[in-house]
């Protein structure tokens, strides 16, 4: 009887103690997360910087393009390196090829004398690259996968995919991107855009 009575006294106290311990551990974990979050955000902001922020914000507003998409393209294309040049000849922060430059210049009506050699200048590269994203948005529709695939593989290839039921079920979006490098590029840019939004919105 005495043992039973002791158990009746001890068990509620033990359960209460364990509950308090669990609460204390939860509070410690929560506090640790709150303390570490600013440091983690700082590390992420260094990994995903808003380089050329003024230029990107200015031309994104001018051409009605999501600035986070422009940051993501710059990050994946060149890691914001203005002197970047690919093995196929794409130049600058947004890695534009010369035929694309000529097309954008014509569509912009730019008669300032800007040349492809100036694509190594961040302002020229960002203006032309952002304008190209805007033009693709108007030509190919609002779907970002389609826009980015067009930026990477060209409008002709993407239009052919949209017309092929194997790649597009509705003619407006891409269910599958047949070029593995373009598929990787699109997914990587969208993933990077989401990180920028999470960090800076």
Predicted regions and their residues:
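Catalytic glycan-binding domains that act on GlcNAc-containing polysaccharides
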Residues: 33-201
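N-terminal export signals and maturation junctions of secreted/periplasmic proteins
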Residues: 2-58
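A general, composition-driven signal for non-globular sequence regions
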Residues: 1-2, 7, 28, 71, ...
